[in-house]
């Protein structure tokens, strides 16, 4: 069994954990949040809020993997203490529209981080994404965290990764609510140094490239149905 460099935060991957103990961290709070976003009865407000919390909690996990520095501080008691702090803020990037709630959660962990946005629309016949908007800051030599709700076929996130890689970042980390095995393999085949943090993994992609059991279209569930054409 291939040892994925993936941090999967759900007990579903027990078989993976035996081969690679470092990739499995059981988090009941994430399981509860994934249950909420899977539930078809969850309204838009609570769906967005759950995704926001998933983004925040996954980013706290990412924080443990980032470079740190030790900073000394003198307290009001005229005594000094030393604490480990993140060496520098990463650049946060998300894919519109579905990734916006997760980005909001990520910004709670890194409120001063630079942020970038990518607009993509998937062709439902070819399953390929057309890039409609690129608005990202300079990421040269920096750690970049890319968030999207779903890692399904991996097409959209792979396109996002390739855009970021043109600037030679120091590190790329993916944060997803739900990831499919096929998408994970595709990303790591492209770049095995990428780390993937996911709250859940699903085993199946249907004929339309949607994750099963999945949760539906994250953008539509967050903000309502969009018109296919104007």
Labelled PLM ranges:
Residues 9-230:
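PRPP-associated nucleotide enzymes
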Residues 2-9:
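Sec-dependent signal peptide recognition
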């Amino acid at each position: 069994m291939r040892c994925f460099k993936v941090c999967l935060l759900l007990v579903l991957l027990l078989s993976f954990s035996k081969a690679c103990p470092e990739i499995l961290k059981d988090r009941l709070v994430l399981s509860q949040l994934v249950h909420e976003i899977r539930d078809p009865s969850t309204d838009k407000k609570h769906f967005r809020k759950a995704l926001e919390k998933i983004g925040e909690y996954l980013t706290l996990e990412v924080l443990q993997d980032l470079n740190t520095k030790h900073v000394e501080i003198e307290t009001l008691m005229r005594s000094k203490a030393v604490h480990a702090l993140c060496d520098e803020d990463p650049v946060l990037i998300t894919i519109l529209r579905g990734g916006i709630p997760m980005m909001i959660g990520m910004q709670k962990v890194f409120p001063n981080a630079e942020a970038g946005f990518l607009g993509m629309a998937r062709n439902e016949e070819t399953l390929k994404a057309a890039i409609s908007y690129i608005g990202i800051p300079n990421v040269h030599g920096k750690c970049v965290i890319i968030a999207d709700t779903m890692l399904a076929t991996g097409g959209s996130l792979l396109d996002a990764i390739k855009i970021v890689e043109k600037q030679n970042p120091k590190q790329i980390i993916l944060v997803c609510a739900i990831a499919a095995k096929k998408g994970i393999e595709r990303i790591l085949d492209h770049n095995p140094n990428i780390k993937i943090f996911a709250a859940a993994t699903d085993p199946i992609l249907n004929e339309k490239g949607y994750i099963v059991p999945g949760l539906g279209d994250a953008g539509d569930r967050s903000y309502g149905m969009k018109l296919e054409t104007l």
